[in-house]
Amino acid sequence: GGDEVEVEDNIRARMEEGYQYVRCQMGMYGGAGTDDLKLIATQLARAKNIQPKRSPRSKTPGIYFDPDAYAKSVPRLFDHLRNKLGFSIEFIHDVHERVTPVTAINLAKTLEQYQLFYLEDPVAPENIDWLKMLRQQSSTPISMGELFVNVNEWKPLIDNRLIDYIRCHVSTIGGITPAKKLAVYSELNGVRTAWHGPGDISPVGVCANMHLDLSSPNFGIQEYTPMNDALRDVFPGCPEIDHGYAYLNDKPGLGIDIDEAKAAKYPCEGGIPSWTMARTPDGTASRP
């Protein structure tokens, strides 16, 4: 949502549909979902007069966000949500590695009182050594892993109990077999699964995630994006959603297929997703 009230309204709608776990973002990651700096300023101003820094005259096109203004707005968002909705609903927030490690540590400490289900991706993979300091200063549960590509990234975090949820992208780490090994290793160390399931994952990937969920005693939660009619038309066997739970069918294998003839009706469109063109107020390119 664009402000606390809009986020609250959207959560209430999800609660009426039966959802018990909701990821809460004000704007997109880092609070930005547009390259219109005036609109960003207006959105943040709604969050109790938080103003982003000004940009230079000849700013480069991109999705602008102010990490400092964002970090100030997040605790105020969850203060509003807990006051209005209480503690019977579980909240998640995704930092998307868009702040400095020190800011992430401070954010995790500040959010403790709001009892998040977890804080997602507080630091980038190249900054995972900072998680030790974060863990020493905050009890906010941490989820990480969607950008990991090899065992040397996730193993030390699990060995040293620096994360609570592992959320790798299954195909990126090698597929179902490596992911199952990771799930078992995580189970031995008290870490639960939360496989990456963004809106751009295929229904085949969604089914792979869910079969891993069903076979893992340490299942934590599954990120899930609702599927439109076109996807259900092209991929017969898509999971069904009912009151916040996702259901697989009992067909062989992953239980899903692809109709290539129907897929041909939906040609790919080129272009760069605008949200990946992230920039800080002075125009510096940032990770998406």
Specify the residue positions occupied by each region the protein language model found.
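Shared catalytic-loop signature of beta/alpha-barrel
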Residues: 109, 115-118, 124-252
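Metal-dependent enolase-superfamily TIM-barrel catalytic cores that perform enediolate-based chemistry
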Residues: 1-132
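Extended hydrophobic packing segments that form well-structured cores
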Residues: 254-288
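Short, electropositive, low-hydrophobicity segments enriched in small/polar residues
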Residues: 31, 149, 248, 257-259
